[in-house]
Amino acid sequence: MATKISQDNPLSKITIFLIIISVIWVKLNVKPWEKGKVIDWDIVDYYDYLPALFIENDWTLSFVKKNEEYYYNNHIYWPQKTSEGNYVIKMSMGLSYLYLPFFWIGHLEAKIKGLPTDGFSQPYHKWIYLSAVFYFFIGLWFLRLFLLRWFRDKVVAIAIILLVLATNLFYYATHESAMSHVYTFSLFSVLIYLWDRWFAYNKLLTGMFIGFISGLIVLIRPINIIPVVVFPLFYNLIDIKQIKDRVVYLLTQYQQIILMVFFAILPWIPQFYYWHLNTGQWFYYSYGDEKFFFLKPQIINGLWSYRKGWLLYNPLMYLTILGIPVLWKYRRSLFWSYVIIFPLYIYVVFSWWCWWYGGSYGGRAMIDIYPVLIFALAAIIDRIFNLERSLRFFKYVSMIPAFMLIYWNILQIIQYRHTFLHYDSMTKEAYWKLFGKPALSDTAYWSLLSPPDYEKAKRGESEYP
């Protein structure tokens, strides 16, 4: 049953502030901007819309032709080429909206310090990197507000601590934080809170925010249309048969739904314009020969492989499976949205040709739906706190594996940071050779790695050589 949010709930508040302080501390110690290692790889494509528009004043990227080798080799601009020879940025521009205020802060700092104002000097890297802290705080705060509708303060606090510190979310909040996942995690946390408020109070302004945030989430990562659509259909249903009533209710609110759709389209309008400007098409698939293989989903590999198994490298998330019957029995209102989003998302995510998602840590694609997966985690924690007095000792014993999971995640992050836990080439032999060690001096270890065959994977074949 949902509970009224207390104005106090100090433990979960303190938890979030301590997490953010920890994230900032790690960031200020890592300082990747000093080596220009923030706006790089995928982030180049998320970010390039901003300097191209506001500094080069050229969204067609025609200036790249003048020195193409320099731009590509230095990972500054590396757009795709259309069949007509035009340039088009591969990723959609959703993250650029979120980067924008921090881009201008970096631009101002570069001007004040007399550094190049080309969009790629150190201040730009720094502020894009730090932008994730702002959005991560917002995401955690709204996730907390949502969870407090269903769970006690101490349960929410512990669930958030474990979700952040014992999973790959912590790595992407502190190290590669300019990647999309912390941003989409945060936006989806806000979205589920807004849907809860909309169903409770049916406010027009809430609906407008729901629409815009939904459109932005999908623009950043189109695969996220799954939780964006499924959650409001199945949230807070006790019985699956109530889906008919939910659809009927939404149809009776057609004016607000139309308004939501309108606001969902708004963030896409500049993207449509950009595609049309550079390709002549209002909608353009910029991923070339990269695609989904829905008849060959790599679910087993995606969850358990040594290369990049999500559950292997995030063992805490086994509780997201074990917690399903707990949700069914004790938090039925959260159950249906959970059991539909979770397997459907796994199926689609691991149907992508590059199911291991390139150079990354621990199945990063799953982070986007962590605001939903925390339901089962919180439900299990809640049941532990509700054990009979004779079993209360289990509550304290359970703290041991909780601390071990946090320790294990931090250890793996250290391994990954120093490339011992390899970004795409782990094998069974390498995993067990490295197991439990922060580093290795044995040079023979590197011969145990097995890089994936990306070209074979693009054809839907096994990437193992």
Language-model features, listed with the residues they occupy:
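Start-transfer (signal-anchor) and selected internal transmembrane alpha helices
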Residues: 1-31, 138, 148, 156-157, ...
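Transmembrane signal-anchor helices characteristic of membrane glycosylation enzymes that use polyprenol
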Residues: 10-40, 48-51, 58, 161, ...
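Membrane-embedded, lumen/periplasm-facing catalytic core of multi-pass transferases
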Residues: 31-38, 360, 397-465
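Transmembrane-helix motifs of polytopic, lipid-linked glycan transferases
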Residues: 126-151, 189-194
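Specific aromatic-rich, kink-prone transmembrane helix
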Residues: 183-201, 205-214, 372-376
